């Protein structure tokens, strides 16, 4: 701790909370350092420490000041925030695609022995049933459609900094127009979901949505993201929503 304070300053815990550091991450960093390490210049007065063959850079820049070189903690915190948002948003895109795949798989079988194929109206099944996309399985049993993905849930119900909700209908801006996905109390006419950041600007910025069409849309809902998402009951990617090109490709524009 004394060494950390000498190197990073009194606020070292903000960038290196020792009680939260994963031992495996430390080992990976040491191996990368032993493979290769260098300083990458960003102008004349700033350098970044890079390690490994891929030159992963420590988010804490080393800058030149009046008394010499030092780690710039404020800029480092901002770089860490940007990286965290990027990681969470990429994870959310993959998670919402996994939701799409899970719903398609779920509807391939009659999950409640009523002779009908349907989509799941909830993510986690009621104990002892298969009415959701995830359920506990015993050793040797097939995984549920969402499988081990649910193992990374946070205690508050989020996943990689995002909340999720299943939507049971769509609005006028969706392909096919407005209609409910419910036939009776079963969701058989389609499915959709929306994901939004738990802490806007910190855990994420963009919100994401997908339906049975398989096109992932994104939108920056702004500072009122939590309120807007709480009021969202329909899949309706209208003004302000655009396809995620990295996932969907140009063909999504015509859907």
What is each model feature region?
Residues 1-11, 117-120:
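Short, well-ordered alpha-helical segments enriched in acidic and aromatic residues
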Residues 4, 22-25, 58, 92-95, ...:
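Stable alpha-helical elements in mature extracytoplasmic
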Residues 12-59, 153-160, 165-173, 178-187:
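Surface-exposed, charged secondary-structure patches
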Residues 19, 52-55, 85-96, 110, ...:
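Solvent-exposed, acidic/flexible segments
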Residues 47-50, 54-88, 215-219:
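Short beta-strand edge/turn micro-motifs at domain boundaries
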Residues 80-115, 122:
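Surface-exposed beta-loop interaction hotspot
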Residues 106-204:
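Flexible, glycine-rich surface segments
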Residues 192-239, 243, 254-255:
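C-terminal soluble interaction/assembly domains
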């Amino acid at each position: 701790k004394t060494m950390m304070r000498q190197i990073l300053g009194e606020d070292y815990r903000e960038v290196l909370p020792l009680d939260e550091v994963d031992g495996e991450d430390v080992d990976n960093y040491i191996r990368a350092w032993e493979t290769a390490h260098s300083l990458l210049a960003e102008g004349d007065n700033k350098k970044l420490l890079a390690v490994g063959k891929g030159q992963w850079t420590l988010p804490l820049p080393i800058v030149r000041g009046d008394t010499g070189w030092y780690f710039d903690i404020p800029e480092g915190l901002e770089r860490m925030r940007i990286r965290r948002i990027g990681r969470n948003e990429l994870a959310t895109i993959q998670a919402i695609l996994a939701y799409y795949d899970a719903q398609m798989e779920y509807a391939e079988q009659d999950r409640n022995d009523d002779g009908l194929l349907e989509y799941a109206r909830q993510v986690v099944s009621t104990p002892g049933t298969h009415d959701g996309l995830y359920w506990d399985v015993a050793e040797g049993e097939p995984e549920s459609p969402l499988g081990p993905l649910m193992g990374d849930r946070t205690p508050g119900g989020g996943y990689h900094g995002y909340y999720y909700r299943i939507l049971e209908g769509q609005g006028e801006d969706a392909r096919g127009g407005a209609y409910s996905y419910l036939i009776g109390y079963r969701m058989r006419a389609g499915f959709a979901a929306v994901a939004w950041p738990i802490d806007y600007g910190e855990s994420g910025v963009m919100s994401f949505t997908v339906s049975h069409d398989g096109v992932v849309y994104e939108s920056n809902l702004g500072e009122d993201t939590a309120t807007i998402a709480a009021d969202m009951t329909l899949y309706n990617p209208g003004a302000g929503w655009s396809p995620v090109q990295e996932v969907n490709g140009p063909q999504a524009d015509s859907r």
